Amino acid sequence: LCRQIVLLKPKALILFEINELALYAIEKQLSNINTHYSFKIYPILGSVNNKKRLKNLFQSFNVDTVYHSAAYKHVPMVEFNTTEGIDNNIFGTLNCAASAIESGVKNFVLISTDKAVRPTNTMGATKRVAELILQAFSMNQNITTFCMVRFGNVLNSSGSVIPLFKKQIIEGGPVTVTDKKIIRYFMTVTEAVEL
């Protein structure tokens, strides 16, 4: 997502991430791309569960648009860690959206999932609740425009099943599938961020 935003030549790009290594890696990649452009990249460590930090960040940088993609998205992991999934995916979204309104952010885009449609697992349910939070905020204020996009299976993203399948094949199998009758649809990372 950030690599695509860079191509739009923003005034500044604020990267807000809880994972130090992930933040370091993306900041380095974007800094290399940014040699062709002239805008600032700010790598900021933090959690969407720290509302005070979010509000301060949005106000300090006069943020115009938020792309909220912070989520726990590995279905089995969220099933095993339900409380953390709820805390991050639901309350993190609530904090981020409320901070956006309080800070006068114009646009807020939630990155959601196709698993939020008639959810059958905790991760899908938490993302559906996150969508409902934005819908409620949209009806009760006119400061921030909220929208959301549901991604399906994104090839080679951090949540993709493809690396797991590759590993299982290299190791001689078996390839684990949840349901032999299921049909999976995939999109590339580029296709996903262009939505």
Question: What is each of the regions a protein language model found here?
Answer:
Residues 42-65:
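Conserved Rossmann-fold cofactor-binding substructure of NAD(P)-dependent oxidoreductases
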Residues 19-22:
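Helix N-cap at the beta1-alpha1 junction of Rossmann-like dinucleotide-binding domains, i.e.
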Residues 4-5:
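Aromatic pocket-lining residues of Rossmann-like dinucleotide-binding sites
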Residues 68, 72-131, 136:
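Conserved Rossmann-fold NAD(P)-dependent oxidoreductase catalytic core, especially the SDR/UDP-sugar
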Residues 44-45, 87, 179:
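Conserved residues in the N-terminal Rossmann fold of short-chain dehydrogenase/reductase
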Residues 10-11, 58, 62-67, 75, ...:
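Proline-aspartate-enriched helix->loop->beta-strand connector
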Residues 31, 98-101, 122-195:
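NAD(P)-dependent short-chain dehydrogenase/reductase
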Residues 43, 85, 108, 146-149:
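Hydrophobic/aromatic anchor residues within beta-strands of the central parallel beta-sheet
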